Structures are given as structure tokens and as C-alpha cells.
Amino acid sequence: MNSQETEIDKEKELEQKVQEYWTCRAHDFSTVRKNELKDNEISGRWLAEIGQNLPVSSGLDILDVGTGTGYFAILLALHGHRTTGIDFTRAMLQEAEETADSYAANASFLYMDAQALDFPDNSFDAIVTRNLTWTIPEPEKAYQEWHRVLRPGGILLNFDASYADNVRNHNQKESYVSFKDVYGHCGITPELEKKNAEITLSMPGSCKSRPRWDIELLSKIGFSNVSVDKTAGQRILREKDLPDAPLFLIYAKK
């Protein structure tokens, strides 16, 4: 077996671990996102943050990459956009579809790899994604695909954080903060938290200086007007923003 085949096998193994983790978490994670949908204040903050970065307030074709249980896709569909959510975990998509039905939200959901999108070029006006890029084995490949399916002038809004920094502080009691403590995540056992830490530190982005690394990748791929807002978490999550892994917003235009 050559080095390239070995690398491919490692990536597939890592993807499988990610899928298994989120399959296990799907139902409990859905509870968290349903609570957010019910919370007009937090949903209003997300809508304000996204809306101020989009060219119009409704009627856009928007792709929610790594939709999970469908929060962004449902929220934006309820406010007049045509949304498609994709995810690589079927259990998450099942939760998303059930939640969308309960809200009568006109959002569609597809099983798809964020690194290999099954859409024609120039399909979407905007791409939104939340807490995804830290879970991707090949971020550059994903960014290239996102650039491809955006229409000219299309917008990428990537909300993420350098979660590896929080994991690395696990043994520093005064610094480390568990997701279940600040985000209200339920069903997280010590075993699941350990798996999450292992996955996080296995990803390429875990050893990079983020979001600077992302900015360099996006510029290299051909995005323009690339910028980062490191205070997004303070406005949206407020006291729930992780001190060691604050939420940032990466904006990029095709």
C-alpha cells in the first residue's frame, strides 16, 4: 500500500468516526437546536447576523452545509429563502426533516459530503455553515467545492471556532469549558466527550492558526472580500461563547 492509499484510508476512517459520533448524538443534539428555534431572542440574533451579510432579506437560494438537525435551513426558510441543507449523517437529516415538518418549513435536506457536492456549478446565492469546518478532513477541498457551487457574487458565511484550543485546555480546570456546560448540550457522557476530543485533535485544522489559516485558503481558492469577525460569538452567543474557542464569522464573496 502506497502513502497516498494510506492517507485515503486514514481520511475514510476519520470520516467514519465523525459519522458514528454524530449518529449517536443526533437525537439529543436535535433537542438543543429545537430549543434554539423556540427561542426568539437567540434566533433573532442569528437572523440579524446572517441578514446583514446577505444582499436581500428573502428569496435567495441558500445552501446550509453541515446542516445537522437543520437549524439554519429551517430558520432561513421560515423567513422567505429557498434553503437546502446537506449533511453526512443520516440520523441528523432525519431529525432535520421531522423538525422542518413540525414548523411547515419549506426546506429540503440531502445526504451529501461537504467535500464533494452533488450540485451543478453556480447553484446558490449564499452558503451558510456553522461549526462544520473543524470536523472536515480536507477543508481546502470543501472550500473549493463551496466556491464552485456559488453563483458569481455569491456569499459564504462560515461560523466556526478553533475548538481544538478548548480541548487542549481540558486539564486546565480554570480554562477548559465543556460544551454541555455552556451550550446546554444534553446526553454528553464522559465517553462521548472523550471521542469528541479525539476527533477534534485528529483534524487538519486542529494544529492551524484559525481563522487566519482559513482566510489564506479562501483567498488562494479565488474568493474575494475575505474577512473575519472575531466578535460574532459575543453578539450571538454572548455568555455562552467559549472563552478558549470564541465563535468567529468568516465572510467571503465569489
Label the predicted regions.
Residues I221-S224, R238-K254:
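Core SAM-dependent methyltransferase catalytic element
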Residues E140-P152:
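A short glycine-rich, Lys/Arg-flanked "PGG" loop and its adjoining helix->strand segment in the class I
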Residues N2-S57, Y71-L75, E95, I155-P190, A232:
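Conserved class I S-adenosyl-L-methionine
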Residues A126-P139:
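A short SAM/SAH-binding and catalytic strip from SAM-dependent methyltransferases
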